[in-house]
């Protein structure tokens, strides 16, 4: 029997989560109810951010977003664990970009390395 599973993350900010998903080319919807894929008999789940009718993120009691999806009917070509890693990396990128901007800096250059690390060069005129 199929059911919605959750995968915990350390993601805490909704705006950066949405930006990260959009950078990864996902169509993002807010405040949606996930539906039972293939008419499986499990309860509907309300999520804060969704990227389809059966995949989303909801805020848990620890103030962190968790991925909610029916893993048995996962359609994305990227496996769930790798998907969370990619979203987390883009979330970190957006968080750093937003903090840099708040501090008055500007990103001059950005590189994604072969090992998937990201390097930035930032400047600020004083």
Which residues make up each language-model segment?
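Interaction-mediating elements
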Residues: 1-126
């Amino acid at each position: 029997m199929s059911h919605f599973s959750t995968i915990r993350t350390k993601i805490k900010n909704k705006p950066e989560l949405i930006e990260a998903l959009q950078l990864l080319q996902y169509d993002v919807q807010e405040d949606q109810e996930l539906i039972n894929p293939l008419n499986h008999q499990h309860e509907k789940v309300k999520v804060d951010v969704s990227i389809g009718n059966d995949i989303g993120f909801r805020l848990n009691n620890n103030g962190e977003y968790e991925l909610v999806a029916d893993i048995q009917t996962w359609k994305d070509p990227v496996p769930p664990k790798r998907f969370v890693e990619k979203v987390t990396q883009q979330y970190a990128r957006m968080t750093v970009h937003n903090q840099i901007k708040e501090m008055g800096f500007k990103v001059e250059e950005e590189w994604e390395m072969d090992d998937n690390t990201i390097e930035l060069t930032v400047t600020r005129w004083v």
